[in-house]
Swiss-Prot record:
Assigned protein family: Belongs to the HARP family.
Keywords of this entry: Endonuclease, Hydrolase, Nuclease, tRNA processing
GO molecular function annotations of the record: ribonuclease P activity
Catalysis performed (reactions): Endonucleolytic cleavage of RNA, removing 5'-extranucleotides from tRNA precursor
GO BP: tRNA 5'-leader removal
Organism name: Aeropyrum pernix (strain ATCC 700893 / DSM 11879 / JCM 9820 / NBRC 100138 / K1)
EC number of the protein: 3.1.26.5
Broad class of enzyme this protein falls into: hydrolase
Coiled-coil boundaries: none
Function field: RNA-free RNase P that catalyzes the removal of the 5'-leader sequence from pre-tRNA to produce the mature 5'-terminus.
Domain of life: Archaea
Protein name: RNA-free ribonuclease P
Length: 214
């Protein structure tokens, strides 16, 4: 693993769904399945909680985590044990303020990406008219390209926005491997950690506690 995350992480973090589903984290944990990874994470978060680190998620993120885990064979009891070590809180959406410049940039980005998406759709229509490719192949290609040009690297879900707003409200670091959420958080001056970096931070805290006790 790499070095310890910056000390500005503090005692509160807000996590998105990728904290619990990240493939790289699963690899670092040595988990062979999502079920095993969830069990290990529950134990790690329990230890983190005892050291004073609080992990928040929003209701929309919790629902997304549960859907994903249930759909991938994680037992409901395991999910409940994992969720026992996080706090669920919605952002106060009517009281928060965002910089006008950020909102303007976001609208400009959305418009530019929609234009690219339209060109991708037009290209695939022309390809369908002049080629003998299977319809399924063309549709698959269209979906992949359209998603790449219109969604990759930007806020593209309610869950992302909720996570960003809650972190802003709490003045907390964000834990995510999502590129779009990371960029938006950094625009607002928030600290961002990947799921693996959070694990490193927790392990570093444990080492500090041990050294103090000794």
């Amino acid at each position: 693993m790499g070095g310890r995350p910056p000390p500005s992480v503090g005692s509160v973090v807000v996590a998105d769904t990728t904290m619990f589903t990240d493939a790289k984290l699963r690899e670092v944990l040595g988990a062979r399945s999502l079920e095993e990874a969830a069990r290990i994470m529950a134990r790690i978060l329990a230890r983190a909680s005892r050291m004073g680190l609080t992990v928040y998620i929003t209701p929309s993120v919790r629902a997304e985590i549960e859907r994903f885990m249930l759909g991938n064979g994680v037992h409901p009891t395991t999910i409940a044990r994992l969720m026992a070590w996080v706090r669920v809180k919605p952002p106060t959406t009517h009281e928060l303020r965002l910089p006008a410049a950020m909102f303007r940039r976001y609208v400009e980005t959305v418009r530019a990406r929609l234009d690219k998406g339209l060109r991708v759709a037009e290209d695939h229509v022309r390809r369908a008219l002049r080629s003998r490719d299977e319809e399924g192949d063309i549709v698959r290609s269209l979906r992949e390209k359209y998603r790449e040009y219109t969604r990759k690297g930007m806020l593209d879900s309610v869950e992302d926005v909720d996570t960003l707003l809650l972190a802003l409200e709490l003045g907390a670091a964000i834990v995510t491997s999502d590129e779009g959420l990371r960029r938006a958080a950094e625009d607002l001056g928030l600290t961002v950690l990947t799921p693996v970096e959070l694990l490193e931070y927790i392990l570093a805290l444990e080492e500090e506690v041990k050294s103090v006790e000794e």
